[in-house]
């Protein structure tokens, strides 16, 4: 009795014969047309067409989309047109001047030091000069700035200064010379791993800030993707994820795929699933995201990470040292967010925010050392010896790590729980009151310390302008237009919530008398930047802002620049 395989083969015999006939005809047709060409011509045409196909593929499938490049080219050509281009440039120059004037914080009677003094100054003279510089700062001590300074408490400052001083000359690059500093950094990482419920194989690194922490995670997953054969690794991140992911994509030759949000300003998990491709190197969640203070659904995204075997990074730079204490503070979160969630492979958390360490201190943590190894840079062939560094920097200030360790030890678990309790209590009170003010609304359901406001009745940047006039410094956001206030321990202890609400109510009442009025000042510039289709022009204006930071030219001072574009 014939086998099943033999019967199936016999059934397909007619089709195989038909296929053979057509393949023979195709072969004869091609050979017939090639007889009129010499062999060298066939080879030349094959090479040319191969190169054209490769060029076409690379041209179409670049990290930046074809449509985006087409728009840039059109805008560039438009700006070169005689009449239209001149008008655009005139308006652009005026806006640049406005930004430069608003960036001039130097008083009229002050000048910049542009050369070394011929004779060195005494210690007292240097300190007196620095005191003059510090007096130029805005009065952040009053608790009117969004985020920025997260404690500022005098006794803590004294402790941090002393800790930094004791390690001022130390450098983690030389663990053999500074073993105490190595111990400090190892302890900081292990404490953080414990707080985020990492297992025995969890690990991490101390970095200079949230941006570097994010960059390091992206670099690790890029190299992991390279090992898997992915040539153009993609970062799939929510629209609200920090701009540092764009910076990582730019620095490391990756492509970022932004995923839309739901009405509650959380990442749309279905859209994220659709965005996953064979080139996806990592997924991203925020806890919370910077613009609106909303926590992404980490467990749901983690399921995608497990299903498709893709690393998941949780960006907790802003709220990391709040969320780990929320439950003990009496404000438990609805879903887990850390290494307890299967699929979470890395977390970034800033100790220089709600960890109350000095600026320049952050952490990137991994669930397993196998991921961290991809972050490291090692050069085995340098003439100066084998060069290996865990993060971007080579030399780093040991004093910052010492001060970070001091802050962790000084607060302890109870101190952090109490601080979290004060901050969240203040934030929840503000949120409930702001939701009841007619003319504005709160974005999403912020559960931590950031509250974002919008309006359906007027340009929200007008509210930012009026609050600036009252001495507040809020952050301006875009897509959609909004502003936010980040509550810190300084705000909670200064009890500024009542005054903040009073000023918001007064400002909204004033605006609602003429809700359609146009925004002026920096609010208008920010609004214009959001509606400008040519994003290269916006980037050009942003460069003016960055240039101004290092300018030593004396410029006539304009009105105060509100809604700082920088993150906390």
Curated annotation (Swiss-Prot):
Belongs to the group II decarboxylase family. Sphingosine-1-phosphate lyase subfamily. Its main location: endoplasmic reticulum. The lineage of its organism: Eukaryota, Metazoa, Chordata, Craniata, Vertebrata. The modification N6-acetyllysine is found at residue 353. Residues 62-568 are cytoplasmic. The modification N6-(pyridoxal phosphate)lysine is found at residue 353. Changing residue 317 to S: Almost no sphinganine-1-phosphate aldolase activity. Homodimer. This is Sphingosine-1-phosphate lyase 1. SUPFAM superfamilies: PLP-dependent transferases. Its cofactor is pyridoxal 5'-phosphate. Keywords: Acetylation, Apoptosis, Disease variant, Endoplasmic reticulum, Lipid metabolism, Lyase, Membrane, Nitration, Phosphoprotein, Pyridoxal phosphate, Signal-anchor, Sphingolipid metabolism, Transmembrane, Transmembrane helix. The modification 3'-nitrotyrosine is found at residues 356, 366. One of its GO terms (biological process) is spermatogenesis.
């Amino acid at each position: 009795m014939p086998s099943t395989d033999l019967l199936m083969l016999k059934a397909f015999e007619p089709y195989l014969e038909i296929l053979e006939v057509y393949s023979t005809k195709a072969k004869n047709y091609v050979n017939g047309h090639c007889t009129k060409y010499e062999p060298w011509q066939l080879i030349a045409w094959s090479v040319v067409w191969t190169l054209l196909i490769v060029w076409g593929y690379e041209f179409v499938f670049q990290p930046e989309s074809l449509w985006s490049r087409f728009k840039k080219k059109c805008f560039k050509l438009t700006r070169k047109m005689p009449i239209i281009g001149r008008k655009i440039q005139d308006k652009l120059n005026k806006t640049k001047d406005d930004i430069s004037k608003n960036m001039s914080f130097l008083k009229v009677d002050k000048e910049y030091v542009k050369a070394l003094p011929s004779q060195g100054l005494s210690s007292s003279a240097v300190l007196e000069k620095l005191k003059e510089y510090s007096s130029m700062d805005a009065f952040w001590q009053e608790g009117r700035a969004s985020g920025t300074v997260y404690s500022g408490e005098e006794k803590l400052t004294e402790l941090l200064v002393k800790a930094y001083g004791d390690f001022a000359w130390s450098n983690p690059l030389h663990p053999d010379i500074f073993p105490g500093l190595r111990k400090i950094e190892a302890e900081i990482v292990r404490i953080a791993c414990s707080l985020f419920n990492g297992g025995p194989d969890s690990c991490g690194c101390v970095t200079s800030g949230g941006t570097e922490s994010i960059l390091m995670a992206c670099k690790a997953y890029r190299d992991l993707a390279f090992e898997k054969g992915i040539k153009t690794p993609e970062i799939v991140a929510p629209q609200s994820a920090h701009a540092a992911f764009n910076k990582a994509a730019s620095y490391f030759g990756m492509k970022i795929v932004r995923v839309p949000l739901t009405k509650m300003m959380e990442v749309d998990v279905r859209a994220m699933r659709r965005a996953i491709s064979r080139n996806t190197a990592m997924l991203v969640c925020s806890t919370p995201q910077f613009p609106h203070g909303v926590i992404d659904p980490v467990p749901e995204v983690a399921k995608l990470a497990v299903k498709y075997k893709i690393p998941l990074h949780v960006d907790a730079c802003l709220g990391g040292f709040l969320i780990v204490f929320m439950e003990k503070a009496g404000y438990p979160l609805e879903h887990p967010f850390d290494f307890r969630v299967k699929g979470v492979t890395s977390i970034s958390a800033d100790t220089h925010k709600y960890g109350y360490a000095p600026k320049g201190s952050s952490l990137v943590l991994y669930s397993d050392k196998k991921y961290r190894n991809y972050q490291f840079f090692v050069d085995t062939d340098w003439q100066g010896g084998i060069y290996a560094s865990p993060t971007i920097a080579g030399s780093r200030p040991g004093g910052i790590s010492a001060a970070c360790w001091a802050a962790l030890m000084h607060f302890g678990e109870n101190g952090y729980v109490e601080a979290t309790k004060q901050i969240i209590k203040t934030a929840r009170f503000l949120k409930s009151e702001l939701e009841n003010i007619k003319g504005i609304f709160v974005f999403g359901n912020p559960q931590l310390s950031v509250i974002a406001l919008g309006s359906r009745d007027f340009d929200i940047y007008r509210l930012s302008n009026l609050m600036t006039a009252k001495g507040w410094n809020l952050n301006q956001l875009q897509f959609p237009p909004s502003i936010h206030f980040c509550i810190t321990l300084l705000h909670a202890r200064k009890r500024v919530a009542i005054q903040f609400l009073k000023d918001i109510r007064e400002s909204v009442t004033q605006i609602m008398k003429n809700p359609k009025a146009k925004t002026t000042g920096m609010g208008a510039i920010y609004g214009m930047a959001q509606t400008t289709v040519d994003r290269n022009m916006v980037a050009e204006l942003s460069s003016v802002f960055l240039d101004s930071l290092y300018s030593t030219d004396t410029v006539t001072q304009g009105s105060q620049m509100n809604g700082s574009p920088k993150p906390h």
